[in-house]
């Protein structure tokens, strides 16, 4: 089934501009899903520290989703700590690896963490199984459902998942 959706990735937007743009999109096109890429690029004028800014942006987006009865999917970068950890399991992103993780964790209904071992030059798991083409989506928070891992195969030549 086709669901009206909209992707916004303009790094010049501040949160107020984005909120207005989303409201217009929803009222004009009956959009049900909004994708925002990415949290760290949204400007918030009155917050001095990054974690304050991320928290305020998350709060505004959560309120907007509830007000408009829509889903807002927000992409977020990871901090650099994961790059310094050694081994397969240590490289799997955790909620604490998200920039502004405490606010994101508190407000999000679902948090998915994407992990592609080859990105970190990890080609074998703890049991010695080849993971070079693995692409894992870890469901690390789900307010109304189960946690777990969805394992896909990444094909580098076609940039596709199966």
Label each residue range with its predicted role:
Residues 1-48, 56:
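Conserved inter-motif catalytic segment of the P-loop NTP-binding fold
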Residues 14, 53, 100:
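Conserved acidic
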Residues 45-50, 160-162:
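Generic structural signal for short, solvent-exposed loop/turn connectors between secondary structure elements
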Residues 50-53, 131:
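Secondary-structure capping and boundary motifs in well-ordered enzyme cores
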Residues 57-162:
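Phosphate-binding/switch region of NTP-binding enzymes
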């Amino acid at each position: 089934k086709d669901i009206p959706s909209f992707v916004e990735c303009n790094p010049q937007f501040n949160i107020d501009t984005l909120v207005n743009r989303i409201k217009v999109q929803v009222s004009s096109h009956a959009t049900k899903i909004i994708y925002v890429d990415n949290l760290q690029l949204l400007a918030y004028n009155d917050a001095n520290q990054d974690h304050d800014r991320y928290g305020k942006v998350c709060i505004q987006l959560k309120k907007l989703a509830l007000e408009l009865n829509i889903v807002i999917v927000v992409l977020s970068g990871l901090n650099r700590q994961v790059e310094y950890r050694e081994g397969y399991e240590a490289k799997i992103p955790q909620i604490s690896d998200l920039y502004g993780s405490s606010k994101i964790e508190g407000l999000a209904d679902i948090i998915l963490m994407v992990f592609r071992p080859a990105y970190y030059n990890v080609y074998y798991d703890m049991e010695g199984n080849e993971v070079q083409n693995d692409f894992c989506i870890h469901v690390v928070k789900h307010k109304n459902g189960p946690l777990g891992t969805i394992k896909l195969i990444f094909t580098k030549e076609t940039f596709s998942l199966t």
